[in-house]
């Protein structure tokens, strides 16, 4: 397959105008069963393509899934979050930035048991807000999360307080909050917390 490295573990297919038909073929191909990193950023993927991907029986070894700059909506995200048919149980890195996702579906993603292995989550450049931040703060599923990207979102001081009061905050090594709604109060919350003890990059 075009883009497949010789070790068959990395497949880069960004910017190829792929949509549902191509994803259907990809998800069914036995050639991808060793792929650990799949980059489908900047394509034409919508909710149907997401469902096909998330239920693929060939991508069981996938650990990193890049879906930034596509057309995934709340419907598709909520379906994946609540699905009992998803086969992608080992995703450690998930990039969803710059899709059509709102605070509602992002909060459901965070609460879902389907993403309990996540170490890195990029949900920037969308409509993540306090509901998402509060869900992260209350989460007992994202216990491996070390990197969280929330660039250009709508989290304010109240939301960041809820996020860093939670158990997950203590594990975070990277937290990107550039261009949110934090204001002076939010900055004070971050500066005054002992909870971000492992943070290396802010």
Regions found by a protein language model. Name each.
Residues 17-24, 44-51, 71-78, 100-107, ...:
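Short, solvent-exposed loop/turn at the beta-strand->alpha-helix junction
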Residues 43, 70, 90-92, 134, ...:
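Asparagine/serine/threonine-enriched low-complexity, disordered tracts
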Residues 26-29, 53-56, 80, 85, ...:
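Hydrophobic anchor residues at the C-terminal helix/turn of individual leucine-rich repeat
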Residues 92-157:
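Solenoidal tandem-repeat scaffolds enriched in leucines and small polar residues
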Residues 1-50, 68-74:
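LRR N-terminal entry segment and analogous cap-like coil->beta motifs
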Residues 12-18, 39-44, 66-71, 84, ...:
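Concave beta-strand-loop units of leucine-rich repeat
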Residues 3-10, 31-37, 57-64, 85-93, ...:
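Leucine-rich repeat
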């Amino acid at each position: 397959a075009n883009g497949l490295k010789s070790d068959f573990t990395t497949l880069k297919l960004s910017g190829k105008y792929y949509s549902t038909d191509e994803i259907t073929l990809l998800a069914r191909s036995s050639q991808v069963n060793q792929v650990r990193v799949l980059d489908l950023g900047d394509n034409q993927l919508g909710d149907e393509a997401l469902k096909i991907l998330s239920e693929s029986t060939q991508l069981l070894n996938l650990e990193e899934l890049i879906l930034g700059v596509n057309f995934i909506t709340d419907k598709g995200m909520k379906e994946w979050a609540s699905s009992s048919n998803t086969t992608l149980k080992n995703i450690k890195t998930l990039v969803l930035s710059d899709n059509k996702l709102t605070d509602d579906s992002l909060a459901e993603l965070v609460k879902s048991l389907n993403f309990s292995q996540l170490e890195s989550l990029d949900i920037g450049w969308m409509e993540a807000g306090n509901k998402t931040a509060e869900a992260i703060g209350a989460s007992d599923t994202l216990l491996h999360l070390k990197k969280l990207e929330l660039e250009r979102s709508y989290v304010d001081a109240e939301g960041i307080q809820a996020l860093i009061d939670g158990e997950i905050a203590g594990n975070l090594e990277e937290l990107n909050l550039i261009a949110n709604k934090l204001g002076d109060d939010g900055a004070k919350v971050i500066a005054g917390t002992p909870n971000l003890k492992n943070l290396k990059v802010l």
